[in-house]
Amino acid sequence: MMVLVTGGFDPLHAGHIKYFEAARELGSKLIVGLNSDDWLKRKKGKVFMPFNERKIILENLSMVKRVISFNDDDDTACDAIYQLIKM
């Protein structure tokens, strides 16, 4: 079973790792939906680490099966869920 977590992860910290570990226990594949730089600017007013750098870091975590970008203009994870269903 796939498990989806979403967020900006900017910057990635120990709390995120614990979140990923807990989510990974719920299924066999952990998929991370990564929010865009535009989303971060709207939410936090700035970007600490650009999307591509955050994506590379997440992709190199052994517990993460795949990282997807998604459109979060409506402040939901619906687009990420839709992409997950299509996988």
What spans do the regions from the language model cover?
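Nucleotidyltransferase catalytic core that binds NTPs
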Residues: 1-87
